[in-house]
Amino acid sequence: MKKFLIICAAIFVLFGTSNAYAAENFAVEVLNLVNAERAKVGVAPLRLADDLQAAANIRAREIVQNFSHTRPDGSDCFTVMQYRGRTCGENIAAGHASAYETVEQWMNSDYHRENILEPAFTEMGVGYAYEDYSTYHHYWVQLFRG
């Protein structure tokens, strides 16, 4: 019985943290892709901000349930961040498994592309959530702040 519990605990640790590991890796991939797009038009690169990363991951889990810029409690999407009058933006996407496909999807949308290329933005957070039993499975959030 003890061996069984150890195996179960190991499986939980391995698979329970895989979504967080994926989110962290995807954030770096998205940052690199976004900064390449910004460089093409002469806009300064963004940097990842830890607080925006945390907020974007909260939003990614929220949009699994309700794919909207409105939070589950009915409040504005920006209430998840401490922006207090700063310039900010949010991009959401669903359905693509890779950072490349997701950034490409955003770049093919006028509104999302404007956020990515906005010169006033200096920081970004990227959130990712995977839910096997949901409509789109892969959920992405970008939060921007300037």
Walk through the language-model features, giving the residues of each.
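Hydrophobic side chains within well-formed alpha-helices
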Residues: 26, 30, 48, 52, ...
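Positively charged n-region of N-terminal signal peptides that target proteins for export
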Residues: 1-4
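A short alpha-helix/helix-coil micro-patch that ends at or immediately precedes a cysteine
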Residues: 23-66
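Short, surface-exposed glycine/acidic/tryptophan-bearing loops
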Residues: 54-100, 116
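Sec/Tat signal peptide C-region and signal peptidase I cleavage site
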Residues: 17-22
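Disulfide-stabilized extracellular recognition modules
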Residues: 94-146
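Bacterial N-terminal signal peptides
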Residues: 8-16
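Surface-exposed patches in mature extracellular/periplasmic domains of secreted proteins
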Residues: 40-54, 67-79, 113-129
